């Protein structure tokens, strides 16, 4: 196991970008017993959310394949915190079935985002299509300052 990230291998998209999703993880190769990982956080730890700001709104997109809209909650808490959560139930086992591989996640996930002051928290809209949740938080219009021209005498 190397403690130095490889700059010429792997999936790193840009070694100089501090926000790259493919950043080196020093704990990646550590084996953690499953009993020590919280059941609530273990299921969708990799639930990825994109947040972009347009001139009109803050737009959040989350990939949550296999979930129905009834299994997902979008809430505003503490006035400015957007919370996206959901749960995928474990598939029921039949004694006559033989499982060869179980790779799909089950359990709960929660993601929270502190919204900026310009967010209209009373006008949030959410939709889900093809396993992608889109949450749109409109922004307040930036008020342009009133400018009054002053005539110069003399």
UniProtKB/Swiss-Prot annotation:
Residues 40-154 form the sHSP domain. It holds the Pfam family HSP20. Keywords: Cytoplasm, Stress response. Coiled coil: none annotated. Its main location: cytoplasm. It comes from the Eukaryota. One of its GO terms (biological process) is response to salt stress. One of its GO terms (molecular function) is unfolded protein binding. InterPro entries: A-crystallin/Hsp20_dom, HSP20-like_chaperone, Small_HSP. It is found in: Cytoplasm. GO terms for cellular component: cytoplasm. Forms oligomeric structures. Belongs to the small heat shock protein (HSP20) family. This is 17.5 kDa class I heat shock protein. It comes from Glycine max. The lineage of its organism: Eukaryota, Viridiplantae, Streptophyta, Embryophyta, Tracheophyta.
């Amino acid at each position: 196991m190397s403690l130095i990230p490889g700059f010429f291998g792997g999936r790193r998209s840009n070694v100089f970008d501090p926000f790259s999703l493919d950043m080196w993880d020093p704990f990646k190769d550590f084996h953690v017993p499953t009993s020590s990982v919280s059941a609530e956080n273990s299921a969708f730890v990799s639930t990825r959310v994109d947040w972009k700001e347009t001139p009109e709104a803050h737009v959040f997109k989350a990939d949550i394949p296999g979930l129905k809209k009834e299994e997902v909650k979008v809430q505003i808490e503490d006035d400015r915190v957007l919370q996206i959560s959901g749960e995928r139930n474990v598939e029921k086992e039949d004694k006559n079935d033989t499982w060869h591989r179980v790779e799909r996640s089950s359990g709960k996930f929660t993601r929270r985002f502190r919204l900026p002051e310009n967010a209209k928290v009373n006008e949030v809209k959410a939709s889900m299509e093809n396993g992608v949740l889109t949450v749109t938080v409109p922004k307040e219009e930036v008020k342009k300052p009133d400018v009054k021209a002053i005539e110069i005498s003399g």
